[in-house]
Amino acid sequence: MDMNKDLVAASATPLVLAILAEGDSYGYAIIKRVAELSGGHLQWTDGMLYPVLHRLERQGHVAAKWAAAENGRRRKYYRITREGRAQLAAQRQQWQAVDGTLRGIWMKACTV
């Protein structure tokens, strides 16, 4: 199933914050986790992820640091901040409201 580009963009921030709430991570691992969580429906690229990470970093919702990976190469690891956790909680409430509204509308539409 092809996902609507607007839906993918709208879900990017809460997805990234939720993944980082599980623990620190780096770009490629975040992309893999998105694919895993979506059952393969969301196939992100570097070009989709890094602008989101950079924006979240500018907003103070994510912090980044360089560290050596197991193979000795340096990777940039991202972690969610206290402000990011607050933003995640706010976005969760907003998405739950949208979900509830859509479910209600769709249930009525299916009975008409």
Enumerate the predicted regions with their spans.
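Short, solvent-exposed loop/turn elements at beta->coil junctions and helix N-caps
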Residues: 4, 67-68
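N-terminal helix-turn-helix DNA-binding core of bacterial DNA-binding proteins
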Residues: 4-48
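Basic amphipathic alpha-helical segments that dock to polyanions
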Residues: 49-56
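Glycine-centered, phosphate/nucleic-acid-interacting loop/turn motifs that mediate DNA/RNA or nucleotide
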Residues: 60
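Short beta-strand "wing" residues that participate in macromolecule-binding interfaces
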Residues: 64
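Basic, amphipathic "hinge/linker" alpha-helix immediately C-terminal to the N-terminal HTH DNA-binding motif
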Residues: 70-92
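Amphipathic alpha-helical dimerization/coiled-coil segments
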Residues: 86-112
